[in-house]
């Protein structure tokens, strides 16, 4: 699944 967990995305997607 296309999960984005690097810092820039972690803010939005809270990984």
UniProtKB/Swiss-Prot annotation:
Expression sites (tissue/organ): Expressed by the venom duct.
Protein name per UniProt: Alpha-conotoxin-like MIB
Biological classification of the source: Eukaryota, Metazoa, Spiralia, Lophotrochozoa, Mollusca
Subcellular location, principal: secreted
Residues modified to Cysteine amide: 15
Function: Alpha-conotoxins act on postsynaptic membranes, they bind to the nicotinic acetylcholine receptors (nAChR) and thus inhibit them.
Record-stated family: Belongs to the conotoxin A superfamily.
GO CC terms: extracellular region; host cell postsynaptic membrane
Keywords annotated in UniProt: Acetylcholine receptor inhibiting toxin, Amidation, Disulfide bond, Ion channel impairing toxin, Neurotoxin, Postsynaptic neurotoxin, Secreted, Toxin
Domain notes: The cysteine framework is I (CC-C-C). Alpha3/5 pattern.
Location within or outside the cell: Secreted
Keyword Secreted: yes
Superkingdom in the source lineage: Eukaryota
Molecular function GO labels: acetylcholine receptor inhibitor activity; ion channel regulator activity; toxin activity
Cystine bridges: 4-9, 5-15
